[in-house]
Amino acid sequence: MKAALLLVIFSLMLIGVLTKKSGYPTDHEGCKNWCVLNHSCGILCEGYGGSGYCYFWKLACWCDDIHNWVPTWSRATNKCRAK
């Protein structure tokens, strides 16, 4: 019984640790990371534990499978001030 309980607890902890997300990672001002080439986005996204590319139509880095703690851009919470 104790072993089953421990297994459930560790499984829930592991699920929380391994959860990943996708999106536009933001800089310290809340703006999307500007790009033109895929290489720079690949390096940025690898630093966040995922992979990515430059979404050329929007000139912004898109990352897949990045950690949940990475702040990502959202229209609802947009704090970016255009320069």
Curated annotation (Swiss-Prot):
In Pfam terms, one family for this protein is Toxin_3
- Localisation per UniProt entry: Secreted
Q: Which residues form the propeptide?
A: 83
- Key words, A-Z: Disulfide bond, Ion channel impairing toxin, Neurotoxin, Secreted, Signal, Toxin, Voltage-gated sodium channel impairing toxin
Q: Which cysteines are joined by disulfide bonds?
A: 31-80, 35-54, 41-61, 45-63
Q: Which GO terms describe its molecular function?
A: sodium channel inhibitor activity; toxin activity
Among Gene3D superfamilies, the record links this protein to: Knottin, scorpion toxin-like
Principal location listed in the UniProt entry: secreted
Q: So which tissues is this one expressed in?
A: Expressed by the venom gland.
Description of its domains:
Has the structural arrangement of an alpha-helix connected to antiparallel beta-sheets by disulfide bonds (CS-alpha/beta).
Q: What name has this protein been given in UniProt?
A: Toxin BmKBT
What species is given as this protein's source? Olivierus martensii
